[in-house]
Amino acid sequence: MRSSVGEFMIYQVIGTVIGIAGIIVSFARFRESRTSPGGLLLWLILWVSVILFSLNPPFSTRIANLLGIGRGLDFLLIIGILGAYYLLFRIYLMVDRIQQDITELVHEIALREHDD
């Protein structure tokens, strides 16, 4: 039994709604200066891709075939894993920078307290 809404499968509706919500949130974060222009572009590409792959599932298979990957789902899983590793690396860099900032701040506070 296939769940559908009109002509669309339920996952297509959910994927499209999530993609549109992601676009709205991305623009809101950009307006609040919480995302850089490059970050906005990256998120827009991601959310538009979610919408495209949701509305046209064979599209992922065509891209997979162009890249020499067997199935569209395999392609999406590979992209998801690579994206997760990229985000993990970005988080690592952010934590490392924050750790350095905290170390410098603690050092400055210690020097000020020592001088007083």
Curated annotation (Swiss-Prot):
The keyword Transferase does not apply. The keyword Ribonucleoprotein does not apply. One of its GO terms (cellular component) is plasma membrane. Coiled coil: none annotated. The chain crosses the membrane at residues 8-28, 39-59, 75-95. It holds the Pfam family DUF2304. To M.jannaschii MJ1580. This is Uncharacterized protein MTH_137. It comes from Methanothermobacter thermautotrophicus (strain ATCC 29096 / DSM 1053 / JCM 10044 / NBRC 100330 / Delta H) (Methanobacterium thermoautotrophicum).
